Design a protein with these regions (language model features):
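Membrane-embedded transmembrane helical bundles of large multi-pass transporters/channels
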Residues: 1-35, 100, 117-121, 131-388, ...
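Short active-site-proximal "capping" loops at secondary-structure junctions
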Residues: 23, 38, 74-76
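Short, conserved active-site loops that position catalytic residues or coordinate cofactors/metal ions
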Residues: 32-34, 66-73
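Short hinge/gating elements
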Residues: 36-39, 391-393
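Structured non-transmembrane domains adjacent to transmembrane bundles in polytopic membrane proteins
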Residues: 45-66, 74-161, 385-576, 607, ...
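Short beta-strand segments
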Residues: 70, 125, 249
Length: 744
């Protein structure tokens, strides 16, 4: 690491130009190739997936995206001559637009079912030639503009569907800008130097920007969800600025000790840079743990996020030292430079609030530890009510046309019309057709069913489908129960004695199947992530207790963050106020991605905190001193890093995307809890209570473990010399604090 840092400092212009060339080249390639994101929730082997394949084979004309144009009259009927004339003309214009395959009108012979019972709401179905992921935003906008052109006093027109949601996609990068600005303010307050505060941001932006373009190219090679670039940017900005902050802090410490700019930058990368690489590796390993689930949808998310972390780490240990050499001593504030020139290098002694807090934790570990546990328990309680499901356009903000179309359909035709179940089967002969006719009658009397469409056969007569509309909303537990009832009770009885094998599909059933698969694989996934993280910490700190405590802290942080997400998004505490739409279930893939990201981020703080304690333990063998000094020296930088990360994560609530907002709030809550409760309260309290047992490792395991070190051996001796003055002064302070008052 020292050699790499020295090369980057000595050839700083080359290092900067190489990064700019990489950023420009990848961005240009992404602009030429375009994006190819896909939200494919299909899971091999599920019933909904099988139903989708049968439907595609028997009814290929249904393969395009299907959207709705909904209109509502404030008075009178949608069958009024003027309304019918206006909307018929509008639908004809939509049918002539590029990309539109067919338009079904409620005014056609078979359109009676598309008019509400009160006659005030009607809808038309617009089928595109392509799937939603292949539809150009301009095509969707043309449909919206044409439909909206029919609005007048008393006639309201709204549009819903996957393609229509493309027109609601927020433009610009407000969330990223807000996050970066807040981070810059925090960095300036921490450093007192404008130049030093801008370097972590510049480093993170180059690394994340290169990764953002790289993810667009990655979408051409594998399935990558459309939210993956934003998720990568969210995580990348957070960890990228943090990693650079740690290195700049160490560099500034070297300058204050009198080192040259080159020596300070080289030492910072050789020491803290190693911790950054180790921390980044833990994040990547946690993210790649998603590959064990073998779900195509999540593989792309894992690789995309991992790519972002890798590039931010690389920028932190190569681009950053080059930039540090450019600004020279201006990494220090004017006051620090003046003090250094007047008084020379001074030993750093932990003082102020950090030192007092560390001493308080040492004196009251049981009380403060119990308080921290109580906070974690309260925040984690809502997690017990976690319900997985997929949000739909009913969760969109009330100002969007997709949400208003959803509500109009639910009010006019019942809540289930927004999430029907599709039944598909192969048909072998007359007996099967007779059984399907009987099934139609049976379904109409089944609990939870609002209506059933007549059976429709393909042109060859070998595949049949019918649509079941529930009497409950798509996100309701009653709808999920209806799907289970059909699969386990109603359909097996109808199939008895026939060759039928009716499959229950549709978007709602597909989401339920996806959630079931995720829940089934979650224990294995969590075990793999925890196991790999513990193994890394075991190798780094050669202790059994440190990895086990880290695993427990990570589980606590995850549970508490899920509790916050459940309260905001599932229970709806403030979701409408924040512009996040109405309450609904939690996305089924959120726990998997959150466990990966949070375990990685939590390991970061664990590494930076415990590595300093471990260094002190190796030098003194005094656990109480190691914990006290480690907490006092790292708490300020960890808290500054946490404030930056929280600011970046919360800024993504402004993205307008419900999924990204979930990630932002969950990550912000977890980092806040981790930094201000777990790492500065519970972890040191437990380490004080456990004493030397923190560092226990069985002899047989000690002999077999390979040796890796976050701090390089050559820096260990230098650290001992460097801290001699600090040790002496701290001991004097301790002695003075313990001595009784005298009479002088």
């Amino acid at each position: 690491m020292a050699a790499l840092a020295r090369w980057c400092v000595q050839r700083r212009l080359v290092a900067v130009l190489l990064w700019l060339a990489a950023f420009g080249g990848v961005s240009a390639a992404a602009a030429v190739a375009g994006s190819a994101y896909s939200n494919d929730y299909a899971v091999p082997g599920t019933e909904a997936g099988h139903a989708a394949r049968l439907l595609e084979q028997g009814f290929p004309e249904l393969g395009g995206d299907t959207d709705s144009v909904v209109w509502h009259t404030s008075s009178g009927s949608v069958r009024a001559a003027d309304v019918e004339q206006t909307m018929t003309r509008t639908l004809d214009r939509i049918a002539d637009l590029p990309g539109v395959a067919t338009v079904s009108s409620p005014y056609a012979d078979r359109g009676a079912g598309a008019v509400s019972a009160d006659g005030r709401t009607a809808y038309a179905t617009v089928t595109f030639a392509d799937g939603a992921e292949d539809i150009d935003r301009g095509q969707a906008q043309a449909v919206v503009d044409t439909a909206k052109g029919a609005e007048s006093d008393g006639l309201r027109v709204e549009l819903g569907g996957s393609a229509m949601s493309l027109t609601e996609a927020p433009g610009g990068h407000l969330a990223e800008v807000v996050g970066v600005v807040v981070a810059a303010v925090v960095l300036f307050l921490a450093f007192g130097s404008l130049a030093a505060s801008l370097l972590p941001i510049a480093t993170a932006l180059v690394g994340v920007g290169t990764a953002y373009a790289g993810i667009a190219l990655l979408g051409h090679a594998m399935t990558v969800a459309d939210f993956a670039p934003m998720l990568g940017m969210l995580v990348g900005l957070g960890v990228g600025i943090d990693y650079a902050l740690f290195i700049v802090t160490r560099h500034r410490r070297g300058l204050r000790r009198g080192l040259s700019v080159t020596e300070a930058a080289t030492t910072a990368v050789a020491t803290t840079g190693r911790a950054v690489v180790f921390a980044g590796a833990t994040v990547c390993i946690a993210l790649l743990g998603m590959l064990t689930l073998r779900l195509t949808f999540l593989n792309g998310v894992a690789v995309a996020a991992c790519l972002t972390v890798l590039l931010t780490v690389a920028a932190s240990v190569t681009l950053l030292p080059a930039l540090l050499s450019f600004i020279g001593p201006r990494a220090l504030s004017r006051r620090e430079r003046r003090r250094l020139a007047e008084h020379g290098p001074e030993p750093e002694v932990p003082t102020g609030f950090a030192a007092r807090w560390s001493a308080l934790v040492e004196r009251r570990p049981k009380l403060l530890g119990a308080l921290a546990l109580a906070v974690v328990a309260v925040l984690a309680l809502p997690t017990l009510g976690l319900r997985l499901g997929t949000s739909d356009q009913g969760n969109d903000p009330t100002t969007t046309t997709t949400r208003q179309a959803y509500d109009l359909l639910a009010e006019g035709f019942g809540p289930g019309v927004n999430g029907p179940l599709t039944l598909v089967t192969r048909v072998a002969g007359g007996e099967d057709r007779l059984a399907l006719d009987n099934l139609d009658a049976t379904l109409r009397t089944t609990e939870g069913v609002a209506s059933v469409t007549p059976v429709t056969y393909d042109s060859a007569g070998t595949t049949a489908r019918l649509t079941v509309v529930p009497d409950s909303a798509p996100q309701s537990e009653r709808t999920s129960e209806l799907g289970d009832r059909l699969r386990q009770q109603v359909l097996p009885r109808a199939e008895h004695g026939t060759a039928l094998d009716v499959q229950v599909g549709g978007v709602t059933a597909g989401y339920d199947d996806f959630a079931d698969v995720i829940v089934g694989k979650l224990p294995l996934f969590v075990g793999v992530v925890i196991g790999l993280g513990c193994l890394l910490l075991l190798l780094a700190f050669r202790s059994v207790g440190i990895p086990l405590k880290a695993a427990a802290m990570n589980v606590a942080a995850v549970a508490a963050s899920f509790g916050v997400v459940v309260a905001v998004f599932q229970w709806g505490w403030g979701s409408e106020l924040l512009g996040l739409g109405r309450a609904g279930p939690i996305e089924p893939f959120l726990p998997v991605i959150m466990v990966s990201v949070l375990f990685g981020l939590s390991m970061d703080y664990q590494v930076f905190l415990v590595s300093r304690m471990y260094e002190e333990w190796l030098e003194t063998g005094d656990n109480r001193r190691a914990v006290r000094i480690g907490l006092a020296e790292t708490s300020r930088v960890i808290n500054s890093a946490a404030v930056i990360m929280i600011s970046v994560f919360l800024a993504f609530v402004l993205s307008g995307d419900r999924v990204i907002a979930m990630f932002g709030i969950a990550l912000a809550a977890a980092v806040a809890l981790d930094a201000f409760v777990l790492r500065t309260l519970l972890v040191p309290a437990l380490m004080h209570l456990l004493g030397d047992a923190n560092w226990w490792l069985p002899g047989w395991l000690e002999r077999r473990l390979p040796r890796i070190s976050i701090e390089p051996p050559e820096c260990r001796a230098a650290a001992l010399d460097r801290l001699t003055d600090v040790v002496a002064e701290v001991e004097q302070i301790d002695a003075a604090a313990r001595s009784p008052h005298n009479d002088h």
